[in-house]
Amino acid sequence: MDISNVLPASSLFLGIVPALIILYFTLKGYEEYFKDKKIFLSFVAGLLAGFFSIIFESFVRNFGVISLIILIPFFEQIVKTSILNSRLARGTEGAPIYGATLGLGFGSILTPFSIAIYASKWSGLEIVGLSIVTLGAIGFIFFHGATGIYIGYGVKSDRVWRYFIYAVLFQIPLMVVSLVSDEYNLEFLQVLIVVYSIILYWYAAKKVLIMTLPKSKRRKIVKE
């Protein structure tokens, strides 16, 4: 079944909808610690930053494997760091929350482009191939949400560059697996991306995000 004709417009929702669902559950219990306007701005900023990241990646793809493994993580994380270290989040209690929102928006825009790349290689999309590619793309949504939390925590705690470095280091193994999967058509490796990213997001959401709050408020969040 060739479904490539119905995907161009709808594929965007394959990224945005999961990102919004993840964001909804992440924000539960934190309602008094963020502003709705900044949540909206953070998500839109993530979408735009993700789009420009894809353009950047298209330029560096010809520079070799090492460039992809190093330059892309550096560029993507420095973009998120620059946004979060601005007036959007700096000096706010909810910086890690805005980081999660920014990262989820950033990751969501990668889904349609992942599908487009797959379609260009295989001149069409089959259900199984689409499912695998979408699964891997959702993994990147979790990943960028997690690194957004880490960077946001760095902004909150005035250790922004330390957590920026952590985010870059976290992304390098993800890039290696992604490139191997793409180069040798080992789509099943996308499962590793998802597992790695979900674990990273779970830890960031449960252990790092909550550390931004006073101890009394942390206990309240845990109970909820």
Give the label of every model feature segment.
Residues 1-224:
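Hydrophobic alpha-helical segments at protein termini of multi-pass membrane proteins
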